[in-house]
Each structure stands twice: as C-alpha cells, then as structure tokens.
Amino acid sequence: LVLMEGHAAEKRNLKPIARLVAYGHAGVDPKFMGIGPVPAVQNALRRANLKIADLDIIESNEAFAVQAFAVAKELHFDPEKTNPNGGAVALGHPIGATGSILTIKAIYELHRKSGRYALVTMCIGGGQGIAAIFERL
C-alpha cells in the first residue's frame, strides 16, 4: 500500500488505482467500545457528500462479531456489500495492519466489481472510530 499526492504519482509515472475522498474519526463514551465507527462513518459521509446507498463496497472491521453487527445495524449496511470476501472474524486482523488490509481489500474489490466508492471503517480502543471513503480510478 503506497499513499502519495496525485502530482507525486504523475512525476514518477505511476498510475493510481484509487483516491481518498474523505475520512472521519470520532469518539464515544468508552463504555460503548466498538460503536465509535458509527459517528466516524457519518463524519466521512458528510465530508464526501455521500450516503450509505452510494457505497459499492464496505469493509468494516470486526473486532468481534457483536461489535460488527452493532455498527452494521446502526448504519444500515447492506449485507451484500459488507465484507464481501470475509471479515476479520474469519480472516483475522493483525494489530497495526488492519487499516492497510481493509483498504487494500476494498480497493481491489472496487476494481473487481467496477464499483465507484468504498468505505473502510474500524473501531479503535477507548471508544474511538475511524472511517475513510475511497474512489476507484
């Protein structure tokens, strides 16, 4: 996974496969650990001027099953678009690599399905959440 400004890619004759459209982060009361992605996703969608229905792929980290279910239910994720090739409960999520793994999965799935937008989101310890929206190029 390589991130860089568009002009830096052009200068090196690299062809980007996606662009970061927007991101969001948020925190909730730590008693509700795992639900932080909800306001983070809402922030990212607002910044991108998009709705959940505009997303073609959703890669939502599964810290554990009930946490993933709560986020998906609260945000009304389409199960057909969410973790289409399996999530962390099935595949694992090495600490420190989760964001990169989810981003790569989302971008490659966008290309495979010729979709436009992908959402990547995960909870972070202490009630925090983070989300990013990518567009296929």
Model-identified regions with their sequence ranges:
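Conserved catalytic cysteine-centered active-site region
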Residues: E74-I101, A106, L110-R116
